[in-house]
Regions:
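A contiguous loop/helix-start segment that scaffolds small-molecule binding in enzyme catalytic cores
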Residues: 2-3, 61, 72-76, 132, ...
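Class I SAM-dependent methyltransferase SAM-binding "motif I" and its flanking Rossmann-like core
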Residues: 1-3, 83-157, 201-202
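Class I S-adenosyl-L-methionine
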Residues: 1-110, 115
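Residue-level signal for well-ordered alpha-helical positions
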Residues: 43-44, 119, 176
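A generic local structural motif
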Residues: 14-20, 38, 63-65, 121-122, ...
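Structural recognition of alpha->loop->beta junctions
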Residues: 27, 96-103, 127, 209-217
């Protein structure tokens, strides 16, 4: 018996992985958070399966269902939104599964920040503009941030920030980040990414809070902050496809014999294993 933590993606049922859907189709127990995972995802469960919306349940309630499935020798599809490894609250479930000696597997899903970038039609890592993305949140009613993970510390890097679970904390975010990024730094609020009512608010650190208040957005939103969100045109091309960039799969023009003789003819020097930036 195995518990499968399955990432359903951020909302669009078509974004679940083939493996994730296949496992849902096979499991006799399917547990999902109905407030974050669309029913269309768990509709793939087999006829007669016990499909449970866990949105109103406690951790003890959830583990009791898993224990019952374990006693019956039935696999469990534990379906989470986005990717389970990011703010998925699976660590406490895994801890209890280990205590109960129950096997588990994690099936990755499309994270909300990646789906949002796709919808915005942007690359978040632009050569010499932004090469780092920090995924974080701010502390409000939830658990405190660990020492050293304060927003000020991340702001000092100048990296693109993807701030989760914090749309009601924009006043504090603006206060902390403005000295580092500037009041005119672009900000995008990605609301309910992947759902039919998704939409995006574009602004700056100085203007975005008013736009969010006017739109009455209070939850299920991701905050992007950083210069890469601008329509950047003045940046160098990636080295990966530059005509002068030589690697094992593309030697210098006119000298094909170099392919086999090159000392760099190793797997780590192929395009798939280099960023090209």
């Amino acid at each position: 018996m195995t518990v499968f933590f399955i990432g359903a993606g951020p909302g669009d049922p078509d974004l679940i992985t083939v493996k994730g859907r296949r496992l849902i189709e096979q499991c006799r127990y399917c547990l999902y958070a109905g407030s974050l995972v669309p029913e269309a995802v768990v509709d793939a469960a087999p006829e007669g399966a016990e499909v449970v919306d866990t949105a109103s349940l406690t951790l003890d309630d959830i583990m009791a269902i898993i224990a019952r499935a374990h006693g019956e020798g039935e696999n469990v599809a534990r379906v989470h939104s986005g990717d389970p490894s990011l703010y998925g609250a699976i660590a406490e479930q895994i801890r209890r599964l280990r205590d109960m000696d129950i096997d588990y597997r994690i099936i990755p899903g499309v994270p909300a920040y990646a789906a949002a970038a796709a919808e915005m039609g942007v690359e978040l890592t632009i050569p010499e503009v932004a090469q780092s993305i920090i995924l974080t949140r701010t502390a409000m009613k939830s658990s405190a941030m660990p020492k050293g993970e304060e927003l000020e510390n991340f702001a000092r890097t100048g990296a693109t920030l993807a701030i989760h679970l914090s749309v009601r904390n924009l006043r504090e975010i603006e206060r902390v980040l403005t000295p580092y990024y500037g009041a005119d730094c672009p900000v995008v609020i990605a609301y309910r990414v992947g759902w039919p009512d998704q939409h995006f608010l574009h602004g700056t650190l100085a203007t975005i809070r008013r736009k969010v208040l006017d739109a009455k957005i209070t939850r299920t939103a991701l905050i992007f902050i950083g210069p890469a969100l601008n329509e950047v045109k003045d940046f160098r091309d990636s080295a990966l496809y530059d005509k002068d960039h030589v690697h094992v799969l593309r030697v210098q023009r006119g000298n094909q014999d170099e392919r086999d003789q090159s000392p760099d003819n190793t797997p780590e020097n192929t395009p798939e294993n280099t960023t090209g930036n």
